[in-house]
Amino acid sequence: MFLINVLTVTLPILPAVAFLTLVERKALGYMQLRKGPNVVGPYGLLQPIADAIKLFTKEPIYPQTSSKFLFTVAPILALTLALTVWAPLPMPYPLINLNLSLLFILAMSSLMVYSILWSGWASNSKYALMGALRAVAQTISYEVSMTTITLSMVLMNGSFTLTAFATTQEHLWLIFPMWPLMMMWFTSTLAETNRAPFDLTEGESELVSGFNVEYSAGPFALFFMAEYANIIMMNALTVILFMGTSCDPQMPEISTINFVMKTIILTICFLWVRASYPRFRYDQLMYLLWKNFLPLTLALCMWHISILISLACIPPQA
């Protein structure tokens, strides 16, 4: 029974990832005044399936001087972690109801660094290694701001459990009182998932393709799927934390539709950002976090702690 539950969570993610690639290409096409994919199938709808067949039927090529074991394990680890993170997300009910589900998600997303680092090191290519080192520094840096923002959210929520956020936001979404944190969180999720304008790990003009430059066929597709699964997961988490997914036990379907629609809107915002902004310089990327986001998030965290303490000091009004 547990296996069926696992499959019902993980299997819908794969077609969602496939069609997100199509939506991205279509959206970027229309934003750049062109059509995008429109040949394979009606309106280009079968393009992701054609891409998947092409990639998984090709033979993977291993560089002669690469570390074959790590080279193969890295993309498998990336996709496994990307799918595992979905387990505690309430949609409206989680696969595994953990007490520390928020901490679990942060820990799992931190482990993604290893797959990128291994792929860059195992490729034995200077471009791949440079991209991997950039990715590691970037991901670790923005994890700091995300963890501090999460701490503020937990103070408002009173629990690390994601299901409790639905109860907290029954009357007011946390995006309204905590909009500065929401803005910093959204920017941090862009950096965490290595998306434009923070896509320095795969800077085509400098590093050819970044950490996955030596990958082809199936392993490359696994990295691609992991990246897009992480994008959808981060947006789903943003919806749970800031935009309230009220769960009605009588009609859980309404809650699921509500949750999915909000996640789709945020995901389209991710694509919109890619179409609108140029890539950051690497020093600007680090400056933004360590000199701007970190002091602000720490100050807001202290502010939220002081609010709770000051409210607790007020005597009850008759």
Swiss-Prot record:
Its EC number is 7.1.1.2. It catalyses: a ubiquinone + NADH + 5 H(+)(in) = a ubiquinol + NAD(+) + 4 H(+)(out). GO terms for cellular component: mitochondrial inner membrane. The chain crosses the membrane at residues 2-22, 69-89, 102-122, 146-166, 171-191, 222-242, 253-273, 294-314. One of its GO terms (molecular function) is NADH dehydrogenase (ubiquinone) activity. The keyword Nucleus does not apply. Its main location: mitochondrion. It is found in: Mitochondrion inner membrane. It is a multi-pass membrane protein. Keywords: Electron transport, Membrane, Mitochondrion, Mitochondrion inner membrane, NAD, Respiratory chain, Translocase, Transmembrane, Transmembrane helix, Transport, Ubiquinone. It comes from the Eukaryota. It is an enzyme of class 7 (translocase). PANTHER family: NADH DEHYDROGENASE SUBUNIT 1, NADH-UBIQUINONE OXIDOREDUCTASE CHAIN 1. Core subunit of the mitochondrial membrane respiratory chain NADH dehydrogenase (Complex I) which catalyzes electron transfer from NADH through the respiratory chain, using ubiquinone as an electron acceptor. Essential for the catalytic activity and assembly of complex I. Core subunit of respiratory chain NADH dehydrogenase (Complex I) which is composed of 45 different subunits. Belongs to the complex I subunit 1 family. This is NADH-ubiquinone oxidoreductase chain 1.
